[in-house]
Amino acid sequence: MLNKDNFDTELADAERIEVLRGPQSTLYGRNTMGGVVNVYTLSPLTYEGVRLTVEYGSGDSYRFRASSYYKLSPDLGMAVTGYFTHTGGFFDNDCTGEKCDWERLGGGRWKTQWRNNRGVRIDNTFSFSALDQGGYPYAYAGEDIVRDGKTVIRNGQISYNDPSSYRRTTVSDGLTVRYDAAKYSVSSITSYQYSDDEMTLDQDFTPESWFTLRQARREHALTEDIVFRSHDGRRYGWLLGAFGFYRHGVMEAPVHFKRTGIEELIVKNANEHLGAIWNEEYSISADELPLYSDFRMPVYGGAVYHESNLRLGRWRLTAGIRFDVEHTSLAYHSRTDMDYFVSKEGGAPAPKRISIDEGNRIAHTYCEVLPKVSLLYAFDEVRNLYISVAKGYKAGGFNTQMFSDILSEKLKWRMAGSQYDEADLMSYEPEYSWNYELGGHFSCMDGAVRGDFAVFYIDVRDQQLTIFPEGQSTGRMMTNAGRTRSVGAEAALQFAPWRSLEINTAYGYTDARFVRYDNGIEDFKDNRIPYAPQHTLSAQAAWTLPTGVKWLGDVVLQAGVRCAGRIWWNEENTLSQPFYALADASVRFEHKHYSLDIWGRNLGGARYDVFYFKSIGNEFVQRGRPRTFGITLNINI
């Protein structure tokens, strides 16, 4: 999945989830810097039947899902899944009196698997989804805004006047063909994805009419990964792969300045900064000013990667390398027309007109070599210690959200007959890291206690960082911080003292700071990196009680807590989310053919924020979901 916007989807009938931390450049086609999450769904060759799910919860939320798994022959199986979810919303927009976070999501999946006795396997998964959302629960996080004695918006208030929404349609197909020979296997993994989305935003998120955005994007993505792999169980194992991808996107992103935005962002700035110099006064009579920006964004790349594994008694040495190349380009077209008036030395206003119609193409090619090495000592099949070193890399890109800022600045300067000296804000450079990790897995009490731990150090150069330029800017941009470092530890423990009781806990600590980053206005050395939680903690206990009633099955009591914080929101470290805890609990009646789950989430009603951003100098945070209750019924036929 090349587009991160498509992560928001339904994981229907997930059988297991595998998480691989850190850079993964020699196992899979697409290079990753932060890790890989593999989701494995039920196979129609190993499971047959019909699965139904019905759920209702707080916020007028409901979910329906139906799956059918069947074999057409011993070697051919198919599965068809359909789903629909609806959320009425939890947060009110005080300006409109309506819920601002409603959502509707529907889609389906068709999975086909075929095997033969000659070592050939074919898997194909076709899926589609359609998403429709309201606006966003963005609460104002600054001092109360008061104009002419009237409060415009208060701290903590969600209140904006212009429509906001998001819709997306996605179609994807993944085909895997694998052949198992006597000593190795070869796989071809081909994927295609089409996405079409449109976002409409009140970008100032206040009751005033500053400016709005409509961003419409269409994208096609094609990937191919060919992997040769030796079979397990040998002293020496190897993997060799070749990967290529092509992605092409087009985007329209017009920004419409409204009356307040025209006066405050264009006219006022022009008069204060340029009018005083030229002894002129500027005015605009229009109530709306559109700034149009169109983009075409083709990206393609390829890689060759290899990994070797050598077993020497209890020792296992793994070494890998990847050669990665990526070409990214941006063709843009920006245009606007503005009528305004200028009066010189108190004279009569004279009408004038500015027309901007310009375009260009920017392109970058990135090449990188990514090595990886690890050493593991196995005490037995479960217990081990390991150390690993890997280089991570993330390609650069373009700041499409800054084009409206650039265009409005050009308007302001051309009002005074001057040219705007355009800064190099359009692109950002790649990010590089070295990841060092020491960890292990352990087990005791005949497997009743299992766990893993890791300590890590990450040295990052040119870290890609989302920032909000100073002043009344209308966009956000990605920039490169000089150098950062992260040091921390993670541990997880599973404890099953009895067959009926299972306890799972996990804790993580991260100290992520700037080592070198100066934006020309302030030095952020030793400040904490935004959006990186200092602590994460989760704990869950499940107790299974047999009822002895055949039609009822077992009763499973579950309780847990999820915690995170502190999370700093900006480079200055002036705003943060303190440590918070979300308590969950459920009672489940579990039978062979059905389960009934009565659950509650965030039982303590914790108030917390999950996102932060700035617009025209104002700070906003996105509210996390409040206390919710619900009931879920699963039926297996």
What do these predicted regions represent?
Residues 46-47, 55, 67-162, 195-210, ...:
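Periplasmic-side early beta-strands and strand-to-turn transitions of outer-membrane beta-barrels
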Residues 229, 235, 239, 311-314, ...:
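Gram-negative outer-membrane beta-barrel transporters
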Residues 91-99, 136-159, 204-211, 254-292, ...:
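Solvent-exposed loop segments that connect transmembrane elements
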Residues 393, 562-570, 588-637:
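C-terminal beta-signal and adjacent terminal beta-strands/loops
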Residues 44-49, 73-76, 118-119, 183, ...:
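Short loop/turn motifs that connect adjacent beta-strands in outer-membrane beta-barrel proteins
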Residues 176-181, 185-201, 384-390, 401, ...:
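Membrane-embedded beta-barrel scaffold of Gram-negative outer-membrane proteins
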Residues 1-21:
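Short acidic/polar hinge/loop motifs at secondary-structure boundaries
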Residues 12-15, 26-93, 98-108, 119-120, ...:
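Outer-membrane beta-barrel translocator/receptor signature
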